[in-house]
Amino acid sequence: MSATVDNTEANASPPKEFTLRSTIALIGAFMALFCTLGFQNAFGVFQAFYHATILRDHSEFDIAWIGSLLTFMIFFFAAPAGVLVDRVGPTHSLTRHLQPLLTFGAIATILATFMISLCKELYQFLLAQGILLGIGNAFLLCPAMATVTRLFDHHRGAANGIMIAGSSIGGIIWPIMLDQLLNKDGVSFGWTFRIVGFVVLPLCLFMVATIRPAPKTPHDSDREGIELSHGESESDHKAQGAEGPAAIIKNPTFLILCAGLSVATFGLFSPLFFISTYATDQGLSVSLAFYLVSMLNGASMVGRVSTGFLADRYGNFNLCFLTIASSGLIAMCWTKATNTVGIIFFALAYGYTSGVSPSDLKKNPPGPNTAVAGHVQSPNPVCRPALDARVEGGCRRHSLCRASNSVSIVLFSRIARSCRLTHSYSGLVGTPISGRLLKHGYLALSMYSGAALLAGAGLVLIARLRQNTKLMAKV
């Protein structure tokens, strides 16, 4: 019987993945990250603009809560959004063309964008740009990323790379667009955000129309039948599949890794949020300060690609530790950049190291904290593959469990939700702490950011040594 199964699996040719339908869905997912994480990555522009104009009576600490709340809501609501994706599917239809999860996310995102254009007070920005936009973004991201994961298997690395690029490209384009509108064309803040809303509106309509799961094929049915033909009940397979996630949640190495990445998140966003205000304080023009955010995000995209190849050669844990530690050291050198060339170099260097993400996602599938992929939602994805085998051991025999393991790439497993929640709290309080420290100068801010990253790197190093104590080993 086993020989028959093996022959059947060997002879079964995988279906073509880059079809017209799947390619259009991939473009829709790219747009989802462009409009959500790409826009979030541009918050440094708003930090500087709000402090200089609309919210000039408020401190950097107060204004930083807007971006921190946005980050928190995206991470926090990834958990319930993930549960709904697990239960009803990423684009489950009440009617043929109604896709409630994506539709809710699109409506909330568009509504928040237009509501921001009416904001005058800090609490209004917190409600619109912090809470409502964050919730909408979470419900756009999760279905989009889940759909790509389910559409692509053999070419998942390329598909995820294209999708994730949307966040970096958004982080480059949005600051340039905002600078052109606010600083050069003299468009009012209200109309600037209305223009942003009119840009996001057709993109959201495109997402809702195109992000659809692949129809079930005979290949899928045959494979599921093969996997359930060993004489064991489906409940037995589910019980075996549950052992993997339960085991890794109790794994000390995984817990130390999550702790390290959460600690690093406290300082991770500080340069991204405050580099524009730092540049203007050093005498750089407002336009160049806006462009620094684009430069930082552009460098993060380069780092995301190149470090993926290095991770394949030298090991995932090793690169994870080195990039977090490098980010911490660069952050501590922040205030040594006092002229135009130095500040640009700092933005490029920090963007490169903090934007690390695996490029070969097929060989090294991302783990619980892929972020949501945008800029620096933490370098942890490269560390997950070393732990994946422990999960897959209990899951590979059942298609439903194996699908659940794939969906963990976009935060929908119990492992992913628990680790993402810890990141949400770190992201919530980390940047406001940076804003509070600004009254003591940017040196205090840079030391805080660097210390948090180095402390997180230390915990990641402990997790790495638990995997293999040999310093030169590929882990």
Curated annotation (Swiss-Prot):
Localization, UniProt: Cell membrane
Q: Topology with regard to the membrane?
A: Multi-pass membrane protein
Entry annotated with the keyword Transmembrane: yes
PROSITE patterns membership: MFS
Q: What are the Basic and acidic residues biased-composition ranges?
A: 217-240
> Which superkingdom does the taxonomy of this entry point to?
Eukaryota
What are the record's GO terms for cellular component? plasma membrane
Q: Entry's CDD domains?
A: MFS_MCT_SLC16 (cd17352)
Q: Which UniProt keywords apply?
A: Cell membrane, Membrane, Transmembrane, Transmembrane helix, Transport
Q: Which InterPro entries match?
A: MFS, MFS_dom, MFS_trans_sf, Proton-linked_MCT
UniProt key word Calcium: no
List the Gene Ontology MF annotations in alphabetical order.
Answer: transmembrane transporter activity
Q: What is its main location?
A: membrane
What segment(s) does the record annotate as region Disordered?
Answer: 216-242
Membrane spanning stretches? 26-46, 65-85, 98-118, 125-145, 158-178, 189-209, 255-275, 283-303, 329-349, 443-463
What is this protein for, i.e. what is its function?
Efflux pump that may be involved in the secretion of leporins.
Which family does the UniProt entry place this protein in? Belongs to the major facilitator superfamily. Monocarboxylate porter (TC 2.A.1.13) family.
Identification of the protein by name: Leporins efflux protein lepC
Q: State the organism named in the record.
A: Aspergillus flavus (strain ATCC 200026 / FGSC A1120 / IAM 13836 / NRRL 3357 / JCM 12722 / SRRC 167)
